[in-house]
């Protein structure tokens, strides 16, 4: 197994939260959950796009819809699928794995969110495609 480096990054969440970037060989995984990413903070968005840069997979807190994340759930410490797409596209990441789903969401709701997220990614794409999936119990991702 190649040597691995781990980089931690402070995120926006009550009580603090850290994202982690795991790099080993030519592979990179970023874990960024329990974090509220905001479009209104350009310096922060740029900083996270750099943190996500060229990741093979970004495991991303997508608890809320964009509408909820910027209105009724603002400052609750969680993000949306749309923000995940925007950051990953800017970063040149290859796979966005939506994680930390709203506990009240049914499987059908999560499937619809994935479908909508894929469509959004498709219509906003300016570079290489970003694969979108939803995390589930016991999921394994081959790098």
Q: Which role does the model predict for each range below?
A:
Residues 127-143:
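Class I S-adenosyl-L-methionine
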Residues 28, 36-131:
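Cap/insert and terminal regions of metallo-dependent hydrolase folds
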Residues 1-45, 50-51, 139-143:
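Core dinuclear metal-dependent hydrolase active-site scaffold
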């Amino acid at each position: 197994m190649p040597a691995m480096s781990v980089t931690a990054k402070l995120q926006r969440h009550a009580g603090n939260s850290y994202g982690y970037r795991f790099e080993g060989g030519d592979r990179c995984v970023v874990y960024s959950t329990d974090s509220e990413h905001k479009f209104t903070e350009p310096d922060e968005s740029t900083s996270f796009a750099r943190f996500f840069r060229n990741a093979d997979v970004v495991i991303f807190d997508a608890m809320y819809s964009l509408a909820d994340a910027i209105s009724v759930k603002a400052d609750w410490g969680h993000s949306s699928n749309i923000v995940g797409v925007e950051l990953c596209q800017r970063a040149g990441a290859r796979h966005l794995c939506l994680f930390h789903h709203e506990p009240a969401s049914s499987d059908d709701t999560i499937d619809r969110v994935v479908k909508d997220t894929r469509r959004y990614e498709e219509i906003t794409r300016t570079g290489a495609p970003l694969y979108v999936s939803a995390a589930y119990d016991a999921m394994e991702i081959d790098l």
